[in-house]
Amino acid sequence: MDSATTFSWAEADFCISATVDGAQQRLVELATIVYDRVCRTNFLAPGFCLVNLGAELSSQAFRRFMLALERQMKHLHRERLDRDLILMSAARFDQQVTTKPHRDGGPDECFLMLGYEPSPIRADLLMSDYSRCAHDMGLTPGEYLEKHNPMFAAGLRILKDYTTRVTCFCNLSFQILLINNSIAEFSEVAPRWQGVLHTATIVNPEESFRRVVNSLMVASVPIGTEEPISSKEQDEFVHTNLVRRSGYDKPSLEDDA
């Protein structure tokens, strides 16, 4: 923890540099570090981390590495908790919309893997530890969001002292941002993942450029649960050129094929 701001994490707590070199041992080591920082059941870890892979990489190799990292985290999860990890969604989109602190829906225990490709579009990212804030206020994470919605100014103010800026984020590199997206209640008897909210402020949006995000949602489930994203769909995620651009906020945009 950063002593200057009580609940803000230092860069060394969440910033990691790595390479995609095919070495299994390095992948195992990276997965262990990432798992420990993201898949927390208390407040001794950030609940998020950023892995910078540099700029000398292809998009397909990047996406393939994301899936390899997720599979290695799956092995860890089985060994430690006798539970499984499954992919709930896999998508690629052009994200150039500023957001407020939010979670992306999904099961009570899940995390996001957001794979950012190099782009001229700059962004500032913030992580807000709403689970810890809720715990300090005697609330569950769900109750906290109902009573102090951070989409509004009053709720946003409460989170100020629980917010960390992702200072190592670089728009010129391939990066994987892993975010504990959970909303589970804290328990020492039956530990469950404790989530954080994320915020993106787009500095210089420009529709003629792209800010490609490769997004995976990963859930913690009992072993034997069927995975919604098939092997074929995972392969398509790696090899597709499709980038979703249209949405509720920009319905007129056409997707890149």
Where are these regions (language model features)?
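N-terminal auxiliary "cap/dimerization" subdomain that precedes the catalytic jelly-roll/cupin core
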Residues: 1-79, 237-257
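Conserved double-stranded beta-helix
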Residues: 75-128, 148-150, 156-165, 199-202, ...
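Catalytic core of Fe(II)/2-oxoglutarate
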Residues: 154-257
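Short, solvent-exposed loop/turn segments at secondary-structure junctions
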Residues: 55-58, 118-121, 182-185
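Short intrinsically disordered coil segments
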Residues: 126-134, 232-238
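A structural signal for short, well-ordered beta-strand segments and their strand-loop junctions
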Residues: 49-52, 112-114, 124-125, 176-179
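A general structural signal for short secondary-structure junctions and capping/turn motifs
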Residues: 40-43, 100-107, 166-171, 206-210
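C-terminal folded domains that constitute the principal catalytic or ligand-binding module
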Residues: 128-135, 140-142, 151
